Amino acid sequence: MNIKRRLKYLTSCLLVSAFFWINSSAWAGGPEIPPSAPWVIYLGGFGGIYVANFEYQGTYLGGSFTVPIGSNVHQNGYTAGGHIGLRYYFSNPWFLGLEFAAMGNSENATTAESVLAPSPDDLIFNLVNQFRIKSNLDLTAQLGVNITPQTRVYIKGGASYARIRHILTVFNPATLTPTISLQRTTHKNRWGFLVGFGLGYDFCPWFGIFTEYNYYDYGRVGLDSLSNIRPNNGADTYHQNVRVHAYSVLLGVNLNFSV
């Protein structure tokens, strides 16, 4: 089991264990939750695991033949960012929240394909795609409850705006050492949605920690169609698209300001 899987497994176990422990102690005769300030503004930073899935589809039209291309690859990376938010206790201990977050994400997802003519021995070129969600901006609403004086659980959902980078590279296999005959980098800005849940704990009125799980879905993204991409400059067309979804597991800190 690699480090990222261990971190993901450990974080998930902590989330589940903490939830059930706090839930049992809070509702089984625990201390009465004192009134909270109606409004809480918070600033925070976080880091964690970020995994994006790219379901890539392409169609190569080579004149007299068609080659379908498809693969499913993952961006197994890390993320870091910050957020600012507002909680309103409309009926203590229940609260509504609004939050804006920004984060940057590491690593690439890479797929490599060989484009063949109808004859299995007729290799035309090798095609390599690299994908990466470089960053995303999230605006979410929250519904939560303080289950102890220091602890809260919540669900969240909203909109996410992602910047997706795509690098397409064509290699000419006819040479002794394959050479790059075409390389194209494009960026796509894409709206999507996210849903998630979290657990927060305040050590004192102004400082606390939190952990979250978030799921993102950006749908199917149309990529640029290209012409004449084969190394020998033959007439052809290449159509491509990719479906993008992701998840993150976060751990962070907050500074709280009661209003």
Swiss-Prot record:
SUPFAM superfamilies: OMPA-like. Residues 1-28 form the signal peptide. It is found in: Cell membrane. Pfam families: OMP_b-brl. Keywords: Cell membrane, Membrane, Signal, Transmembrane, Transmembrane helix. One of its GO terms (cellular component) is plasma membrane. It is a multi-pass membrane protein. The chain crosses the membrane at residues 32-52, 191-211. It comes from the Bacteria. InterPro entries: OMP-like, OMP/PagP_b-brl, OMP_b-brl. This is Uncharacterized protein CBU_1413. The lineage of its organism: Bacteria, Pseudomonadati, Pseudomonadota, Gammaproteobacteria, Legionellales.
